[in-house]
């Protein structure tokens, strides 16, 4: 039975499986000195999708904070789909290998990633800004101003 059928596609359970798998390798006599995540974990697209993000609601905006260590702004794309879905995507590439150099340990995740967030109705999709500084992407979506309350309308009564 494969691991996906046991755990579904829950990233937390899948990551736990990889950690336990690495631990099993160390306790079964495998002398690979593998105390970190396996190469399969590093390359797993679902692991990339598990990129941590915080979402804050401020009085005038929504702020999305996503860890993007090692990425340049050109590697990151921020888009709005279907008028209310914020999409943050990108690709993290591994450095080109130099002749005679090999990885002894590989833990940083490589590959494509994508995070989607459903925006609330009061999000102004025409006023979105994004900045990546020190490996942290901050996307700010301004809120639409609250609708003005309807004023009472006076109807003139005519006498017949």
Curated annotation (Swiss-Prot):
It comes from the Eukaryota. Residues 44-160 form the sHSP domain. GO terms for cellular component: cytoplasm. The keyword Cytoplasm applies. Keywords: Cytoplasm, Stress response. It is found in: Cytoplasm. InterPro entries: A-crystallin/Hsp20_dom, HSP20-like_chaperone, Small_HSP. SUPFAM superfamilies: HSP20-like chaperones. Belongs to the small heat shock protein (HSP20) family. This is 17.9 kDa class II heat shock protein. It comes from Helianthus annuus (Common sunflower).
